[in-house]
Amino acid sequence: MLGIWIVAFLFFGTSRGKEVCYERLGCFKDGLPWTRTFSTELVGLPWSPEKINTRFLLYTIHNPNAYQEISAVNSSTIQASYFGTDKITRINIAGWKTDGKWQRDMCNVLLQLEDINCINLDWINGSREYIHAVNNLRVVGAEVAYFIDVLMKKFEYSPSKVHLIGHSLGAHLAGEAGSRIPGLGRITGLDPAGPFFHNTPKEVRLDPSDANFVDVIHTNAARILFELGVGTIDACGHLDFYPNGGKHMPGCEDLITPLLKFNFNAYKKEMASFFDCNHARSYQFYAESILNPDAFIAYPCRSYTSFKAGNCFFCSKEGCPTMGHFADRFHFKNMKTNGSHYFLNTGSLSPFARWRHKLSVKLSGSEVTQGTVFLRVGGAVRKTGEFAIVSGKLEPGMTYTKLIDADVNVGNITSVQFIWKKHLFEDSQNKLGAEMVINTSGKYGYKSTFCSQDIMGPNILQNLKPC
């Protein structure tokens, strides 16, 4: 896989100044703005619609397992299908060289939640090679726009009810379609492709003007390929989400180990796995969010470094957005500001969602001791595991704070448990307790306080009560 990307950067030789026109779709040039930067030096003319053979495959609650192929060229196929003109339409758009499995999985999950028109776009004939796919996505984007235009004119269907979900090159393809349809409802970019799109004009790539609301999930972002990323680091939506920093996802292969062992065959295999894993996380996160409306809360921050340092655990009274399907519920979703970068952490395996808590504990006791303090928070049904809050010198009267990412959503906090464990060579008989614990969590930053007057020996559980 890496070789394809490198060839894409190094290959030159396409002539300039040509134009091709296709009935229904209009004309396409190979000049500006597609030749404005080095990263688009390979631009050429897109293939004909007949050669690409874009297909629209409809799934609904009436046919969740077997698609109906519908066509704007023959609108009677739409009329004869289960397409509902009173329903929202979500179109899943794959990127380069994709077999369509994630699209089918996406429709399957969406239809568990909603009675919608779920359409998978098949343009595999035009996307088997990356360089051709970059050029062909303009024609395919025009095909999507033509499809929506037919819905508008023949079925009085509002473009505001259309949501395009595009992965990799499919994100920019969605942007091309949106730029042709004023009032398009929403575009979700899933790790938009970087090569040939980094630092390009907005006419070339996905940007906030392409729909009423554009949200983006970055999972393998880089400024250049050799940063080991095939997505773009650039913000290109109203809300841009950078889970785990947006570059390398936990659970994806480590490239360093085989390289240090000089096992280059293993390294080549790991490289392909690395790109595929990180790039795919974007649609995996989105799919998981569909049935978890309270998951993937994200926080505004200048950088992931600052987020990890605990400097960005703040939501305004309007709350923080959630990454994924329910991002459009965010109050400020249409405001493109400098604060549109949002960060969060995920797990390394599915279920990926994590719920962030800020835990502050004030210790009580008589003497300083050496050990580790653990807290566990619980709701009406579930509890988190134990989280280490502080380790080392434990001083009564001091307050210690830690941000933790829980793998369960406990909802409203109803209980807090405290336990401390002394260090191996600590032989004192000291007792410690949690005088007060403050938990801050949720998209609105809810605070809850728990208290106790007890002090306990090591390894003895202390239960705190609301106060």
From Swiss-Prot:
CDD domains: Pancreat_lipase_like, PLAT_PL. Residues 355-467 form the PLAT domain. GO terms for cellular component: extracellular region. Its EC number is 3.1.1.3. It catalyses: a triacylglycerol + H2O = a diacylglycerol + a fatty acid + H(+). The keyword Secreted applies. One of its GO terms (biological process) is high-density lipoprotein particle remodeling. SUPFAM superfamilies: alpha/beta-Hydrolases (SSF53474), Lipase/lipooxygenase domain (PLAT/LH2 domain) (SSF49723). Its main location: secreted. This is Pancreatic lipase-related protein 3. It comes from Homo sapiens (Human).
